[in-house]
């Protein structure tokens, strides 16, 4: 089948151990990263937000599989460049995204992980849960959802009156 979302493995194979999930990603991560495409309008919206003077910080929990390695960071940077996604800072290996968001003065945090959104929101940072295959059927009355990057852009301007 087609894996369209990085969290889909954990959702589809919830009976897997963390070791099995790590083994899967060790084997297939680069291939998945190579063929993945940005969500519709993501590139354009991020570019527009950057042009409006916003700092774009990409916070990901992706981590290097080998200590001292840079393979995941290199592929991530190449993917961002290939897809025209502009950013000021890339933070990899962020297991505590609230801490990273605070360290980088994040005004609006966007993620498709319910866990990460709840964590960041607990620190009083405005948060949007990007709806994806892995979270669309989950009730999240405590989180505000975004269904597209165009909607993210509109919500950002509503929140911050820019």
Segments and roles (model prediction):
Residues 50-51, 81, 121:
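Anion (oxyanion) recognition and catalysis
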């Amino acid at each position: 089948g087609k894996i369209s979302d990085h969290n889909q493995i954990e959702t589809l194979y919830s009976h897997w151990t963390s070791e099995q999930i790590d083994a899967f990603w060790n084997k297939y991560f680069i291939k998945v990263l190579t063929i993945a495409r940005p969500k519709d309008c993501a590139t354009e919206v991020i570019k527009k937000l950057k042009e409006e003077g916003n700092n774009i910080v990409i916070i990901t929990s992706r981590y290097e599989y080998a200590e001292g390695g840079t393979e995941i960071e290199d592929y991530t940077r190449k993917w961002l460049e290939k897809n025209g996604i502009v950013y000021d800072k890339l933070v990899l290996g962020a297991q505590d995204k609230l801490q990273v968001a605070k360290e980088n003065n994040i005004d609006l945090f966007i993620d498709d992980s319910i866990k990460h959104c709840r964590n960041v929101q607990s620190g009083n940072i405005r948060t949007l849960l990007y709806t994806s295959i892995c979270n669309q059927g989950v009730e999240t009355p405590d989180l505000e959802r975004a269904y597209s990057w165009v909607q993210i852009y509109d919500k950002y301007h509503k929140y911050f009156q820019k």
